[in-house]
Amino acid sequence: AGAQAIGANDLLAQVGAYYHDIGKLGKAGLYTENIQAQENPHDDLSPNMSALLITAHVKEGLSLGLLGKLPPAVTDIIQQHHGTSLVAFFHHKARVQNEAEKKRDGRPGLPSAPPINENDFRYPGPKPQTREAAIVMFADGLEAASRSLAKPTPAHIQDLVGDLIRGKIVDGQLDECGLTLAEIHRLREAFIFTLTSMFHSRIAY
């Protein structure tokens, strides 16, 4: 729906969406959509290691795409669908741990906590280079974020879509894809319509 709303290549966006996360296949248990609440493998890992493993699915996906001889336009989407986005959960977790270590640092004989390098918690990129790659970035982020909506009312869905798109703009993730502001607005409306339709049966008015 997003691609159609702005006259982008709808088929390419669909195929890119089908294949964008193939890099997760080898370690599926590490990702939120496959983790059971009682057994989270990240509980035993450092935030840095978790971020490294999570971001690796882009490189793994690109390798699988090339091995499977997918068209370059599709492997580009696999490589670009996270851009250089921040893995915010583990970056925040690392900062919390770092602050706790700093409070402890005043005690004799304990080493100083090393500073947090934000780049260690970012995807390698590149940023989306096409409108289709940006659409897959939006759709992927919204699919994940919408799962956390306890009450998917139209107002909450509008806020979710608006916040995600604004976040990508502020973070510079759309700087190289060629989307205009008018197209971004149309994409926002298309995603709001699609998500509202998907969650309609769950909304308690």
Regions found by a protein language model. Name each.
Residues 1-161, 167-171:
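Divalent metal-dependent catalytic cores for phosphoryl transfer on phosphate-bearing substrates
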Residues 169, 174-205:
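Long, hydrophobic alpha-helical segments that serve as membrane-spanning/inserting helices
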